[in-house]
Amino acid sequence: MRTLWWVLGFVLVGGFGLGYGAGKSLHTERISGSAGDVLEDDPVGRLKVFIYELPSKYNKKILQKDPRCLNHMFAAEIFMHRFLLSSPVRTLNPEEADWFYTPIYTTCDLTPNGLPLPFKSPRMMRSAIQLIASNWPYWNRTEGADHFFVVPHDFGACFHYQEEKAIERGILPLLQRATLVQTFGQRNHVCLKDGSITIPPYAPPQKMQAHLIAQDTPRSIFVYFRGLFYDVNNDPEGGYYARGARAAVWENFKDNPLFDISTDHPTTYYEDMQRAIFCLCPLGWAPWSPRLVEAVVFGCIPVIIADDIVLPFADAIPWEEIGVYVAEADVPNLDTILTSIPIDVILRKQRLLANPSMKQAMLFPQPAQSGDAFHQILNGLARKLPHDNSVFLKPGEKMLNWTAGPVGDLKPW
């Protein structure tokens, strides 16, 4: 019966194309109600942002040293800076600012293999905060409560790529009152504090645009995934990486004809996603990955396997309507779960995914475009206004401990 369902589903579902870019697909559906309104909000006129002018050693010189950072999945911190410099929400008068932004590239320290090294990030962030606190009065009047920082690393402002170490470190103490804009999102986790704005990782829009295929291409792949199932170098026994969820996908479905899964990463990866109905988005070392962005952009229904994940712009994007959540413990039943979804439900998810505004919200295009991820971040900041009077400290009042945290973080940067 499952095979029959898939054949019927292919006939009915396969004709839905991508609809990304020109937005000419007829098979689209707007999100109903307030979610659709929020996604299409225009933040201009609703907030003003003051950008601190920092020495170039905190941003531009770091990028000049390693331009690879522009294409890394953590590049949102760079492009957000560039966007704000020319954004109409920018104000040169700090007295009228609603928010203060510190342009600091804490993830642009890459190994020869392109992996980020966050070990200097806490000292770098601390140095920048000391600078703005010494040269402007605005940090001290709130201790950062009207400031936001982009921290797109694996575990945000915990600044470590290993979860156990990140949990042990916790969020940098000086950022406890600030609003954090971060890719990491997991409920009840020490590296996600209340009030943070969860954003998508950076995926190069031009690169994806270059791999678009005809919108009427049939979706002949039922389930698609490319990536690691085991991380033998860092988790030789195989039970810790992805909490075993990826290993369970491989062991249960490597020989299942409905599942096109492999560790190979072909040159047709983006094209294959456009030929697939479902794209697996399992957790890895962190719960998020660029696959989520790619799936939405290419109209492939994201199958989210990451317990307690907090997804990007969850107050604007109706993830339950466009995706499928599968608990990590239910991975062995993945085939039954997906083949049991009614075809009309799949068709509606595809129509929603075909809506250009849905795709736009996941991207950081150059130049910026209305409704993109930059604007969704601003919308999130605007919705926090006006600031409550409690963010402003009384004369002489202090809440942050400048000597808290690991001893190594206190060394000069």
Model-identified regions with their sequence ranges:
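Juxtamembrane luminal stem/stalk of type II transmembrane Golgi/ER carbohydrate-processing enzymes
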Residues: M1-T263, L352-A354, A361, P365-W413
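Catalytic binding pocket for nucleotide-activated donors in carbohydrate/polymer assembly enzymes
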Residues: T268-A361
